[in-house]
């Protein structure tokens, strides 16, 4: 952190993304992540972003000529759990990890914001997490890919218009095949739209339709 701070100066935000649980044999667990979180906060980092899994260690052996892909083992599964994961599903799956780290950081006398992510696909879930004090910031990847205008729609009071991610991991499947990543909720829509960027095979649009045009 200190080396990075010297490089960018005092007016630049520096945070860290780390795992609340590595989900691999002999890997770090929440107890380790809590310790690291407190040390990161004491060091002066501007935010702590908590994730889970995504390690290469238990990934399946790739086919000849293909790269190792991390989301094929249990650790990778926990990084991007689909809607059929288990009885809990992907919804807010990592929140307890962020909550434990935030609690320890606050008890250590630090106010460093803690970011949580992972299966947070609705405004209600995001707000409830913040109200309970389990995190300070909500991050969303798949939900933002499903609807890049998610935040604008909610702010405008048009939450019913949000194109909600259903966590089938269609996007992850494309990534695993090393194809351009899109969302199945919009990548076949209005393909004849003038000037729309398309995938290499021309079958998918690469950018979601603009909300104003819908």
Name these PLM-found stretches.
Residues 1-214:
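Flavin-dependent oxidoreductase catalytic cores
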């Amino acid at each position: 952190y200190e080396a990075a701070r010297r490089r960018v100066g005092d007016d630049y935000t520096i945070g860290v993304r780390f795992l609340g649980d590595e989900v691999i044999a002999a890997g770090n667990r929440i107890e380790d992540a809590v310790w690291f979180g407190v040390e990161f906060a004491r060091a002066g980092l501007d935010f702590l972003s908590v994730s889970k899994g995504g390690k290469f260690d238990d990934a399946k052996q790739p086919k000849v000529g293909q790269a190792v892909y991390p989301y094929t083992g249990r650790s990778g599964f926990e990084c991007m759990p689909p809607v059929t994961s288990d009885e809990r599903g992907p919804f807010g799956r990592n929140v307890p990890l962020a909550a434990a780290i935030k609690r320890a950081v606050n008890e250590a006398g630090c106010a460093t914001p803690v970011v949580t992510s992972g299966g947070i696909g609705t405004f209600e879930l995001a707000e409830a997490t913040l109200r309970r004090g389990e995190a300070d910031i909500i991050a969303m990847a798949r939900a933002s890919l499903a609807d890049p205008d998610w935040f604008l729609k909610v702010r405008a009071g048009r939450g019913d218009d949000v194109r909600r991610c259903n966590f089938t991991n269609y996007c992850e499947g494309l990534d695993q095949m090393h194809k351009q990543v899109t969302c199945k909720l919009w990548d076949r829509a209005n393909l004849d739209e003038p000037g729309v960027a398309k995938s290499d095979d021309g079958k998918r649009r690469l950018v979601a339709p603009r909300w104003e045009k819908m």
